[in-house]
């Protein structure tokens, strides 16, 4: 059977782009906690000694944005000027406006409601906050129904942060990246071909020490032994030095790690970022709903792989289109799956927000290490509570 390689990457919470995602989502969470109806589009950029927060926010709540910024940066670990970025001394600039009235009128009352079409409770009044396409995906490669490459890459990044924060590897700094190449035989993952870790460190530690510690305390703790062999390639800080990192090394922006946030390139992506957006933005809520649908289809045994595309128009509640691809692994036709999705999942933005309880402040938790396949936190879009209904209707079981 033909063999091929597939690679996915992840980054730690100290990566400049991820700092921005976490700041944007910490602001969103703080606003939702005080005013669940907050409309938020919050973007962040970080560079040497500076954080800029800009966006459009409509809310009855007040939050101290500079304080939230400093708390978030402190939690990540940038607490000393020698790291190139310091939570206590960095400048914080804010530029916040209200949400555009033109956008608000489309979200506040969807087109179907305005034209007198069917209104169920208040759900139909919530139109999509923008046009766009969103994809959801699931596969049975891992217990969490995620592709193996991105799953391993995220676990390596989380472990890299864990050994830093616990002091097990005390010379590490917050910035870091991981990358995993998996070798497949047909559709089955058979081994890890390559592991790459770039970890920011203090300037006095040797490369040999870094390599030894990261192999023993990170790679071997994360990657199952049966997937590693003598031919597995391991690269640790291949440039030879990673002292300057974080915002001092690279400018960061919210929404620049959309592939890391989702499926590591294993599935298609509609292009919309998640962080800093309240759930009326379908870039976020519909992508979560699409994952929920795909995961339940795979968990029900109706396909080994499932990708779903949703399309929305601003101000219109119902999806314009639903497309499902099971890559030849479906136990029923894709037309049947679309029929089941329409029957068992309400994909209007208002219904997604209601069913997945998306007005709660849960977003900072997923702003690093992936929004999907998380086993460390209970996420509503990761639940498989539709499995029995889907299996019964599809297979008669």
UniProtKB/Swiss-Prot annotation:
Q: Quote the EC number.
A: 2.5.1.6
Q: In which pathway does it act?
A: Amino-acid biosynthesis; S-adenosyl-L-methionine biosynthesis; S-adenosyl-L-methionine from L-methionine: step 1/1
Q: Name one Pfam family in it.
A: S-AdoMet_synt_M
Query: Where along the chain is ATP bound?
Result: 15, 175-177, 241-242, 250, 256-257, 273, 277
Explain how, and how many, cofactor molecules are bound: Binds 2 divalent ions per subunit.
Q: Which UniProt keywords apply?
A: ATP-binding, Cytoplasm, Magnesium, Metal-binding, Nucleotide-binding, One-carbon metabolism, Potassium, Transferase
Identify the residues that bind L-methionine. 56, 99, 250, 281
Q: Name one GO cellular component term.
A: cytoplasm
| Single Gene Ontology MF annotation | ATP binding
Q: Which cofactor does it need?
A: Mg(2+); K(+)
Instruction: List this protein's GO terms for biological process.
Output: one-carbon metabolic process; S-adenosylmethionine biosynthetic process
> Keyword Protein biosynthesis: yes or no?
no
Q: Where does Mg(2+) bind?
A: 17
**In its keyword annotation, does this UniProt entry include Transmembrane helix?**
no
The superkingdom listed in its UniProt entry is Bacteria
Q: What HAMAP family does the record point to?
A: S_AdoMet_synth1
Quaternary structure and interacting proteins, as annotated: Homotetramer; dimer of dimers.
Q: What is this protein called?
A: S-adenosylmethionine synthase
Report the source organism: Clostridioides difficile (strain 630)
């Amino acid at each position: 059977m033909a063999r091929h390689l597939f690679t996915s990457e992840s980054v730690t919470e100290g990566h400049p782009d991820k700092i921005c995602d976490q700041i944007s989502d910490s602001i969103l969470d703080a606003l939702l906690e005080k005013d669940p109806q907050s409309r938020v589009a919050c973007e962040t950029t970080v560079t040497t000694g500076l954080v800029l927060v800009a966006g459009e926010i409509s809310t009855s709540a007040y939050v101290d944005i500079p304080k939230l910024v400093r708390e978030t940066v402190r939690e990540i670990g940038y607490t000393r000027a020698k790291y190139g970025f310091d939570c206590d001394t960095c400048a914080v600039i804010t530029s916040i406006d209200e949400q555009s009235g033109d956008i608000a009128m489309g979200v506040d009352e969807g087109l179907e409601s305005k034209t007198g079409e069917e209104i169920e409770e208040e759900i139909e009044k919530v139109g999509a906050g923008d046009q766009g396409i969103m994809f959801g995906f699931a596969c049975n490669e891992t217990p969490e129904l995620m592709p193996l490459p991105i799953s391993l890459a995220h676990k390596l990044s989380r472990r890299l942060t864990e050994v830093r924060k616990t002091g097990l590897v005390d010379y590490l700094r917050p910035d870091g990246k991981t990358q995993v190449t998996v070798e497949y035989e047909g559709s089955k993952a058979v081994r890890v071909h390559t592991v790459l870790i770039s970890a920011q460190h203090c300037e006095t530690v040797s490369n040999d020490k870094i390599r030894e510690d990261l192999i023993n305390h990170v790679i071997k703790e994360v990657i199952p032994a049966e997937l590693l062999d003598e031919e597995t390639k391991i690269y640790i800080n291949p440039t030879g030095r990673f002292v300057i990192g974080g915002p001092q090394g690279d400018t960061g922006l919210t929404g620049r790690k959309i592939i890391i946030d989702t499926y590591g390139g294993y599935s298609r992506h509609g292009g919309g970022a998640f962080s800093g957006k309240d759930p009326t933005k379908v870039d976020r809520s519909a992508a979560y709903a699409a994952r929920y649908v795909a995961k339940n289809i795979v968990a029900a045994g109706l396909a080994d792989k499932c990708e779903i595309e949703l399309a929305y128009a601003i101000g219109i509640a119902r999806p314009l289109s639903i497309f499902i691809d099971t890559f030849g692994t479906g136990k029923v036709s894709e037309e049947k799956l679309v029929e089941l999705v329409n029957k068992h999942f309400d994909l209007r933005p208002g219904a997604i927000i209601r069913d997945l309880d998306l007005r709660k402040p849960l977003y900072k938790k997923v702003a690093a290490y992936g929004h999907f396949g998380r086993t460390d936190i209970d996420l509503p879009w990761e639940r498989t509570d539709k499995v029995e209904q889907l299996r019964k209707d599809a297979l008669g079981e």
